[in-house]
Swiss-Prot record:
Name the record gives this protein: Photosystem II protein D1
Processing and modification events after translation: Tyr-160 forms a radical intermediate that is referred to as redox-active TyrZ, YZ or Y-Z. C-terminally processed by CtpA; processing is essential to allow assembly of the oxygen-evolving complex and thus photosynthetic growth.
Cleavage, annotated site positions: 343-344
Signal sequence bounds: none
Length: 358
């Protein structure tokens, strides 16, 4: 009989595995983190370089490049990483697919590099949240809550461009680019009249309201552990078992302010509601973006309201329709991209004499 005694020294691979999965590290790495770190670094580095120095991009595919970087006259507000060209469409466009680096830059290759690495990175961040919760014996609801902004990012950076047929329709990576995306989205899909967007607004504003209400109620019903001359914050010790506020007092106040059943008498159900309300609403909004990506748009009221004599009764819907058309015209300023809902109508003369050119 042969007995094998294993050496106490670990191999390099075993040491690496122990380090990756250790919860004693100052910052937990995890197996998802092994992929998250390089992808997010690649996205951040490419974004920074492109924001500073990228040349203009032929976003519409019509040889009219749009500049988005600092070196081409933009500032922190107007700057953006411009989406890849409409000539590329939905083709995967890594740097080795272009004939040269100049061509790759001209067609907006950095946008795809940033977006794809970013999406992989934030998926790994979600997985890392679950992994750390699992190793600490916690429930997985933190990563479930994070899935709400994750779904929103996938909706605007991947699902919407796929539905529209080109990554040039993706959201530009910049402040003014984000607002431009919002205006164009409203013009083409009437998102303000989509019920899923309305639910998202209720989630955002409602979540902010509920958060402020909860914080103010807790702060107003703290159990005093300090003197008048000390900060109330010193009355709490990290890890203490005792409640730091009186939930009975908060429940009684809010129940009398509105009505009894508007107030939670269970701290766990209260905090679940505070997490679930905005998360579910953002999920629904992301679903709305994903459906509008395939042109299942918001409600439209293109037919004006008429009175008994056939006269148009002006409504807010008419104002909204005109603003949508105006935004669409400004966005698609070239004749061959002219909005179909305007081009299909009878031409209306706006000048009696054609202006002389030159």
């Amino acid at each position: 009989m042969t007995t094998t005694i294993r050496s106490g020294r670990l191999s390099g691979w075993e040491s690496f595995c122990n380090w990756v999965t250790s919860t004693n590290n100052r910052i937990y790495v995890g197996w998802f983190g092994v992929l998250m770190v390089p992808t997010l670094l690649a996205a951040a580095i490419c974004f920074t370089i492109a924001f500073i120095a990228a040349p203009p991009v032929d976003i519409d595919g019509i040889r009219e490049p749009v500049a988005g970087s600092f070196l081409y006259g933009n500032n922190i507000i107007s700057g953006a990483v411009v989406p890849s060209s409409n000539a590329i469409g939905l083709h995967f466009y890594p740097i080795w697919e272009a004939a040269s680096v100049d061509e790759w830059l001209y067609n907006g290759g950095p946008y795809q590099l940033v977006v794809f690495h970013f999406l992989i990175g934030i998926c790994c961040w979600l997985g890392r949240q679950w992994e750390l919760s699992y190793r600490l014996g916690m429930r997985p609801w933190i990563c479930v809550a994070y899935s709400a902004p994750l779904s929103a990012a996938f909706a605007v950076f991947l699902i919407y461009p796929v539905g529209q047929g080109s990554f040039s329709d993706g959201m530009p990576l910049g402040i003014s680019g984000t607002f431009n995306f919002m205006l164009v989205f409203q013009a083409e899909h009437n998102i303000l009249m989509h019920p899923f967007h309305m639910i998202g607004v209720a989630g955002m504003f409602g979540g902010s309201l509920f958060s402020a209400m909860h914080g103010s109620l807790v702060t107003s019903s703290l159990i005093r552990e300090t003197t008048e001359t000390e900060s109330q914050n010193y009355g709490y010790k990290f890890g203490q078992e005792e409640e730091t506020y009186n939930i009975v007092a908060a429940h009684g106040y809010f129940g009398r302010l509105i009505f009894q059943y508007a107030s939670f008498n269970n701290s766990r159900s209260l905090h679940f509601f505070l997490a679930a309300w905005p998360v579910i609403c953002i999920w629904i909004t992301s679903l709305g973006i994903s459906t509008m990506a395939f042109n299942l748009n918001g409600f439209n009221f293109n037919q004006s309201v008429l009175d008994a004599q056939g006269r148009v009764v002006p409504t807010w819907a008419d104002v909204l329709n005109r603003s949508n058309l105006g935004m669409e015209v400004m966005h698609e300023r070239n004749a061959h991209n002219f909005p179909l809902d305007l081009a299909a109508a009878e031409s209306t003369p706006v000048a009696l004499i054609a202006p002389a050119i030159g």
